[in-house]
């Protein structure tokens, strides 16, 4: 999540009572609406928008205190639009990205892709590619920390 709060270091607890915006039908919306994660403070208000670009406009204009979105997407927005936001020190959620294949696909693409990704990780290719687009690429390759 990004915010314009005037704190040097920003933690989840700093979001208590604040207005948060998420994109509709996303994992952040699901987590915040469920209200079952004790690590997430009670927000003053939770707003959802169908289009994620609305989140950035609302944050830029000060209509919301923070947004919750994938960190890579926020970093890309900041780079593309010369925006200056801060990211929470503690992630709200760590997720992997999946690739789906048809159940009846017999080409073995899932195994080939898994093998290729493992080789790219082992030889540093994946780190090099991610590093071209994002600072601190190791942070985005911490897939071993994910639950199976």
List the predicted regions and their residue ranges.
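Short, small-residue-biased leader/transition segments that mark boundaries at the very start
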Residues: 3-10
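A ligand-binding cleft/hinge motif common to bilobed small-molecule-binding domains
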Residues: 31-35, 58-60, 64-94
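Beta->alpha turn/N-cap motifs
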Residues: 6, 23-26, 52, 68-77, ...
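Ligand-binding cleft/hinge of the Venus flytrap
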Residues: 12, 26-49, 78-82
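Hydrophobic residues within well-ordered alpha-helices
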Residues: 15, 58-60, 99, 113
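Short helix-initiation/N-cap motifs at beta->coil->alpha
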Residues: 46-57, 61, 95
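Periplasmic-binding protein-like
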Residues: 28-32, 75, 79-133, 136-148
């Amino acid at each position: 999540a990004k915010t314009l709060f005037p704190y040097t270091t920003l933690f989840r607890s700093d979001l208590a009572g604040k207005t948060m915006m998420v994109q509709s039908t996303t994992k952040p919306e699901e987590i915040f609406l469920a209200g079952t994660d004790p690590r997430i403070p009670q927000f003053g208000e939770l707003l959802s928008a169908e289009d994620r670009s609305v989140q950035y406009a609302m944050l830029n204009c000060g209509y919301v205190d923070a947004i919750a979105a994938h960190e890579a997407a926020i970093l890309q927005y900041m780079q593309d639009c010369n925006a200056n936001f801060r990211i929470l020190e503690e992630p709200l959620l760590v997720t992997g990205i999946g690739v789906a294949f048809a159940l009846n696909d017999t080409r073995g693409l899932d195994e080939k892709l898994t093998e290729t990704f493992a080789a790219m990780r082992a030889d540093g290719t994946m780190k090099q590619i991610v590093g071209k687009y994002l600072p601190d690429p190791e942070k985005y390759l911490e897939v071993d920390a994910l639950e199976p």
